[in-house]
């Protein structure tokens, strides 16, 4: 949650001067799993020393646009990161997570997130080099 991120940023800044990227996993409405919300993170963390704030995991790129826009509106000058999964997985009988979004669809949705205000783009669960290459090809 936001409180943990605040503590982490303050601890890092007290020890060294390195770039800090804070990403959160959130529900589709932007609320964190434990405390706070993505908007609050975008507003508060840069003031403590975070260089960028964003979202990771929790959903696919097709489901992050609203929260990215909320974060950018709350903190227009803060770089916003988006590192979604390759869609929402299905779980096999053996417990394996299978992600169904292919690299091209991932890149297309990521391009939309860029238009929504995300400045730093990457991938989380279910992505790999082919996904980032497809994203790079869309520049």
Predicted regions and their residues:
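Domain-level signal for soluble alpha/beta catalytic cores
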Residues: 1-139
């Amino acid at each position: 949650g936001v409180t943990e991120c605040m503590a982490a940023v303050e601890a890092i800044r007290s020890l060294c001067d390195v770039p800090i990227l804070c990403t959160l996993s959130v529900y589709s409405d932007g609320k964190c799993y434990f405390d706070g919300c993505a908007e609050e993170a975008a507003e508060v963390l840069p003031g403590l020393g975070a260089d960028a704030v964003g979202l990771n995991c929790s959903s696919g790129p097709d489901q992050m646009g609203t929260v990215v826009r909320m974060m950018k509106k709350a903190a227009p000058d803060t770089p916003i990161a988006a590192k979604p999964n390759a869609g929402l997985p299905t779980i096999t009988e053996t417990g394996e997570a299978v992600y169904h979004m292919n690299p091209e669809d991932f890149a297309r949705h990521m391009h939309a997130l860029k238009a929504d205000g995300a400045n730093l783009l990457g991938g989380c669960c279910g992505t790999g080099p082919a996904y980032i290459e497809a994203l790079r090809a869309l520049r």
